[in-house]
Amino acid sequence: MNRDVLTGAAIFRASSYLDFAVLVVAGEIDISNAEAFRDHLQALVAGPNPAVIVDLSLVTFMDSAGLGVLIGALRGIHRAGGTLRLVGTGAHLVDLFAVTGVHKLLPLHPTVAAAATT
C-alpha cells in the first residue's frame, strides 16, 4: 500500500514494514495541515492492536500542532493496546522533542528498521 497525498506543505505516504503500518511524512507540519496529519494517523490505527511507525525523517518543520497530533495518536494507540514509534534524526526534531519533553514519551529512532525492532 503506497500512496502519496499532498496536503498544504506536507506529503503523506502510507506503506508497511514487517507488521507495522508506516506513515512517511515530508515537508512542514503545522496548524494548517495538522488535521490532515491526524486523519492519516487515525486511518492507520483503526484496527485492533495497531502497530504504527511515523517516519518524520523528511519533515523540515513541526510546531506544537504536530506534536499534539502525535501525543493524541499515542493515547489512542495505547488505549487500543497498540504501539506507536517514531523515526527522525533532524536537529530541529531532536531539539523540539527535547525542549518539550516529548522524547520521554516518544523517542526518535534513526531508521524504520530500528523502530520496528525496538
Predicted regions and their residues:
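Positively charged, low-complexity terminal tracts
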Residues: M1-R3, T118
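Short, charged helix-to-loop "capping" segments that act as catalytic/coupling loops
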Residues: R3-D4, A46
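STAS-typified acidic loop motif
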Residues: D4-D39, L58
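Amphipathic alpha-helical interaction surfaces in cytosolic regulatory modules
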Residues: E28-L106
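Short acidic-hydrophobic, aromatic-tinged amphipathic segments that line or gate anion-handling sites
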Residues: P107-T111
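Short alpha-helical segment
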Residues: A114-A115
